[in-house]
């Protein structure tokens, strides 16, 4: 399977730009690129289905996983097991880009978001 980045329509989610490279496919995992503008955060959430692997491609991001905080830079990885609460924020001075892999694949109905 070949996926062309510029053929994917980005979606907006709480000011995050998400390019879901495997949307609608029934794969064992899913892959997305997330652009996090300066000052934008992802609200507290967790998955009842998937482990999440976030690779920091560009910028700096503060992750909080189960109330522990981590400052991540390009090349760092944050692994969030299924059921663990997390959030993240771009508190840096440049846009951040994250690569996200869900295993098994992402299904919105299994994601829980705290308002």
Model-derived regions, located:
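A short, N-terminal "cap"/entry segment at the start of jelly-roll beta-barrel domains
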Residues: 1-29, 43, 113-115
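Short strand-connecting beta-turns/loops that link adjacent beta-strands
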Residues: 26-27, 49, 93-94
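Conserved short histidine dyad/triad with adjacent acidic residue
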Residues: 32-48
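Hydrophobic residues in beta-strands and at strand termini
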Residues: 36-38, 56, 80
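Histidine-centered metal-chelating micro-motifs
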Residues: 41-43, 62, 78, 82-88
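Glycine- and acidic-residue-biased ligand/ion/polar-headgroup-sensing regions
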Residues: 49-51, 55-61, 66
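Short acidic-glycine-tyrosine-enriched beta hairpin
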Residues: 67-82
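Ligand-binding loop in jelly-roll beta-barrel domains
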Residues: 82-108
């Amino acid at each position: 399977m070949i996926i062309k980045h510029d053929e994917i329509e980005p979606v907006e989610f709480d000011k995050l730009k998400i390019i879901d490279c495997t949307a609608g496919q029934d794969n064992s995992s899913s892959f997305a690129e997330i652009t996090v503008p300066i000052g934008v955060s992802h609200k507290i959430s967790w998955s009842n289905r998937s482990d999440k692997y976030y690779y920091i491609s560009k910028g700096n991001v503060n992750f909080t996983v189960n109330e522990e905080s981590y400052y991540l830079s390009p090349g760092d990885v944050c692994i969030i097991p299924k059921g663990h609460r997390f959030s993240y924020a771009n508190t840096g001075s440049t846009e951040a880009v994250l690569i996200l892999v869900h295993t098994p694949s992402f299904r919105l109905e299994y994601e829980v978001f705290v308002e």
